[in-house]
């Protein structure tokens, strides 16, 4: 079995790497290289500054007789796929005969968590795979081969993607919302994140001018076979493909003991202590300053689209101990290093007290001030000194041991929904370990 892997065939203006892969596979089949198994949809580090949208690469398993020149076929086919030309794209395309080499495995493990240099990636695999196109997308292409090696030992999910006819690209998607809701009712939680948990908005139809009509995610592939029959559309579905993927597996998260070891643009899991009161900033976002066990400080931020996670961050108090996972942004002249929170687990809540007037010892009612420096008095005639105010514990809105997360509409492709963990459909996330 041979492999063809590619990345960076799309741009903000259009295109889609998974669609390019589907078209490539059709060209390969026509040339005599038959598809074997499911194509792989591999999400990479979501914090790469120059990514287009979802930062995805694709790997295609094929069985090709010796007479088929796979490199020539895929190169010719890729030129057709990007014939309209997106100047921002720098495709990477690699062909591997047989099982991908071990070096690809390490590239995947790093590419899903860090930013890699394309030139160094090419050098690392030059002797083991055939590099057909060596643009910036070579990182994702080689990483996709690495995922092909490790997926049997890693958690996987699946996505069924329906594609539009080209004449509909850039127009409003014609999918019957009622059929999506019925599909969700009958298949959830095996399929997940079809609807937003807050307001029920449909999430499976993208808002970009790409060729995707809709995409449905699942913890098992069989249910995706019936999606095209259940989800009704008022435009033709020209292709439908089920991909095996690392989506919703938290593969991007890295457990880090201290901030000094966390790389900018990585996705660390950090244990922190809140040191200042949360503050709201313009736009409805919430920021709070924290520190690690060495006293190194960092801001954590929750943005308005992620509410109610914003309210979770707003409910924190100095002294609270938390575990956070998210995107680590570098320091700028205006802002310190900041973790954009994906998930937050409460480890320990600080006791918060509110100072109140004393309670009358005779009638058990709250006393009132008797005047400046005159202590307190009660309507029954009882009095109390100035220093008799009492501290009353304030109930906290948060709960120790609970992991809070962004809602589906704001969830990253790689981020694991905690409710699937609670239902036993996915393994515990790094925040729970």
Curated annotation (Swiss-Prot):
Protein's name according to its UniProt entry: tRNA(Ile2) 2-agmatinylcytidine synthetase TiaS
Organism expressing this protein natively: Methanopyrus kandleri (strain AV19 / DSM 6324 / JCM 9639 / NBRC 100938)
A GO CC term attached to the entry: cytoplasm
Ligase listed as a keyword: yes
Localization per Swiss-Prot or TrEMBL: Cytoplasm
Alphabetized InterPro entries for the sequence: TiaS-like_TCKD, TiaS_FLD, tRNA_Ile2__agm2C_synt, Zn_ribbon_TiaS
Reactions that this protein is recorded to catalyse: cytidine(34) in tRNA(Ile2) + agmatine + ATP + H2O = 2-agmatinylcytidine(34) in tRNA(Ile2) + AMP + 2 phosphate + 2 H(+)
Enzyme class: ligase
Biological role: ATP-dependent agmatine transferase that catalyzes the formation of 2-agmatinylcytidine (agm2C) at the wobble position (C34) of tRNA(Ile2), converting the codon specificity from AUG to AUA.
UniProt record, GO biological process: tRNA wobble cytosine modification
Gene that encodes the chain: tiaS
Alphabetized PANTHER family for the sequence: DUF1743 DOMAIN-CONTAINING PROTEIN (PTHR40705:SF2), TRNA(ILE2) 2-AGMATINYLCYTIDINE SYNTHETASE TIAS (PTHR40705)
CDD domains (UniProt xref): RPA2_OBF_like
């Amino acid at each position: 079995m041979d492999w063809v892997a590619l990345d960076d065939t799309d741009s903000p203006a259009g295109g889609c790497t998974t669609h390019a892969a589907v078209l490539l596979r059709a060209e390969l089949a026509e040339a005599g290289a038959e598809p074997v198994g499911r194509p792989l949809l591999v999400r990479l580090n979501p914090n790469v500054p120059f990514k287009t949208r979802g930062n995805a690469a694709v790997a295609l398993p094929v069985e090709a007789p010796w007479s088929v020149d796979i490199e020539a076929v895929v190169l010719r086919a890729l030129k057709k796929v990007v014939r309209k030309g997106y100047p921002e794209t720098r495709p990477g395309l690699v062909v591997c005969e047989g099982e991908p080499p071990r070096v690809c495995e390490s590239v995947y493990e790093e590419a899903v968590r860090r930013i890699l240099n394309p030139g160094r990636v090419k050098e690392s695999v030059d002797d083991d795979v055939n590099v057909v196109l060596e643009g910036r997308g070579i990182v994702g292409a080689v990483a996709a081969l690495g995922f092909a090696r490790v997926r049997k030992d890693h958690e996987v999910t699946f996505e069924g993607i329906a594609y539009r006819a080209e004449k509909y690209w850039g127009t409003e998607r014609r999918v019957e919302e009622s059929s999506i809701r019925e599909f969700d009712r009958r298949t959830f939680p095996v399929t997940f994140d079809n609807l937003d948990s807050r307001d029920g908005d449909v999430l499976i139809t993208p808002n970009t001018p790409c060729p995707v009509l809709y995409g449905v995610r699942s913890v098992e592939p069989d249910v995706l076979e019936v999606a095209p029959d259940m989800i009704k559309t008022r435009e033709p579905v020209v292709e439908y493909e089920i991909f095996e993927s690392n989506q919703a597996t938290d593969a991007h998260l890295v457990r880090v003991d201290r901030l000094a070891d966390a790389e900018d643009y990585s996705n660390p899991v950090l244990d922190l202590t809140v040191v200042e009161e949360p503050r709201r900033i313009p736009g409805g976002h919430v920021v709070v300053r924290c520190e690690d066990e060495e006293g190194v400080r960092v801001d954590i931020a929750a943005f308005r689209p992620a509410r109610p996670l914003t309210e979770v961050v707003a409910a924190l108090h100095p002294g609270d101990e938390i575990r956070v996972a998210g995107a680590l942004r570098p320091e700028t002249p205006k802002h310190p290093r900041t973790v954009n929170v994906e998930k937050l687990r409460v480890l320990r809540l600080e006791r918060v007290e509110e100072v109140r007037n004393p309670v009358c010892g005779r009638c058990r009612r709250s006393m009132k001030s008797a005047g400046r420096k005159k202590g307190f008095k009660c309507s029954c005639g009882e009095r109390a000194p100035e220093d008799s105010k009492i501290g009353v514990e304030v109930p906290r809105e948060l709960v120790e041991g609970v992991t809070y997360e962004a809602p589906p509409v704001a969830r990253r492709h790689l981020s694991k929904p905690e409710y699937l963990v609670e239902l036993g459909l996915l393994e515990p996330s790094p925040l729970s370990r």
